[in-house]
Amino acid sequence: MEQPLTGSYVIGQPTSGEQVGNYLLLHELGRGGYAHVFLAEHLYFKQLVALQLLNLSLNQHEDLVRFQVEARLLAQLQHRHIVRALNFDWEGDTPFLAMAYAPGGTIQQVFQQGTPQPLLRILPVVLQIARALQYAHNHHIIHCDVKPENILLGPRNEVWLADFGIATTIGSLPRTSYGRQEIRGTVRYMAPEQLRGTPLPASDQYALAVLVYEWLCGGPPFSGTDIAVCFQRLSTPPPRLRERVPSISPTVERIILKAMEKDPRLRFAHVLEFASALKKASLGQR
């Protein structure tokens, strides 16, 4: 049930052993800018879940709206490669979202920064992410924050795309509650048009291509402060992959750089087309 977006949401920080709704908090899995995530167990079903609780040290209307939007989107997007929403409720003034628990952690723990990965190892992950993104795009949703921390691994090592907290609908512009246009995302993976405040479905394709580049090379195409990366992303072509990893085929390099074109109209028509082209090109690298 939705609560009014007024009043104070500040209470003590959640801790292991506490009960929230019908869930017992076991231990913290992580925390972000606006929420804590706990491994929790349903008191009656004994089902393990990832329980996301709004960061109650904040009292911000926009964070609460974002939390509710994420819950609604996850409930609508039913796909095998998107994390499942199981429940959304309130414990007093505390909103919480129960999601399927990903025992494999995040892909960040598998493809570690600084370690180049073979194309054939990352390809199954790329295809699963692309299918999840394509499904979201077909339902008029742009994820806007594709990055390793938001790619989870389920019980059979399958990929789950998570964190739709800053997702937006196609054709709308992210704005604050005061009507100001807002730039959201993680600079390291943001497309030029997203940096300008106008994300498109092609922005998710760009972010996925940056991930592929990073995994193949062991590092991002651009580095430095967020401001420096922004300027490079808007004005400088990414370094060629083959300069860093000569074993990568010219075809694979061309596909990845096409998906990273600064003009979104020059990228692939759909994110799944990018992943499919990469799969086809990989046959020549066996």
Give the ranges of each region predicted by the language model.
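Activation segment signature within eukaryotic-like protein kinase domains
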Residues: V125-V126
